[in-house]
Swiss-Prot record:
A motif (COPI vesicle coat-binding) lies at residues 228-235. Residues 154-184 form a coiled coil. Appears to be involved in vesicular protein trafficking, mainly in the early secretory pathway. In COPI vesicle-mediated retrograde transport involved in the coatomer recruitment to membranes of the early secretory pathway. Increases coatomer-dependent activity of ARFGAP2. Thought to play a crucial role in the specific retention of p24 complexes in cis-Golgi membranes; specifically contributes to the coupled localization of TMED2 and TMED10 in the cis-Golgi network. Glycans are attached at residue 125. The gene is Tmed9. This is Transmembrane emp24 domain-containing protein 9. Belongs to the EMP24/GP25L family. It holds the Pfam family EMP24_GP25L. GO terms for molecular function: syntaxin binding. N-linked glycosylated containing high mannose. GO terms for cellular component: endoplasmic reticulum membrane; endoplasmic reticulum-Golgi intermediate compartment membrane; Golgi membrane; synaptic vesicle.
Amino acid sequence: MAAVRGVRVVGSSPGLLLGRGMRAFLLLLWLAARGSALYFHIGETEKKCFIEEIPDETMVIGNYRTQLYDKQREEYQPATPGLGMFVEVKDPEDKVILARQYGSEGRFTFTSHTPGEHQICLHSNSTKFSLFAGGMLRVHLDIQVGEHANDYAEIAAKDKLSELQLRVRQLVEQVEQIQKEQNYQRWREERFRQTSESTNQRVLWWSILQTLILVAIGVWQMRHLKSFFEAKKLV
């Protein structure tokens, strides 16, 4: 979803890997790109799904609005209120964590509990699609992840925070989000390491099995040839 999918940060080895300061800087750049806005078109029975990599315990907010194509004006116009949008979100274990019907314009929110790839799917309620007779529906979607999902103007008004207090709170939440992203990167590296070790082990056992098969075939051929020569009284 995001314009920048992420910065891969690995462990520390002198001369080969980035220092802590540079890694933190790259993570800040990555966090800055966590908000992603786009638009897409869907047909009457079509479902659009997007994959977003999200750390655990991270809030995600999605805002969307729909438009119908006006053939007379030859342009997209805001959709009628009767045209709804169904939003479904699944976690990396394929469990549904959000499934709800919204209006033609709305906002959905969820919090991740498992790190990894989350699937966000949207499709319209087909019973209302007769309103535009098989045309295309344009959906504008804006997704904010983590600290970017917070409305700090609302937080400042609600908690009566000064500008300095609000800034400190923003910095604290940014640091917390960076820690979550670092933990997520370590989790991904651990999974990759486990997958690599499992693959290497399978390759090793397959090589051993191939060797045993070749040895067994060689022994069988030797015994078969010996029996053949004995039957022909050549030995």
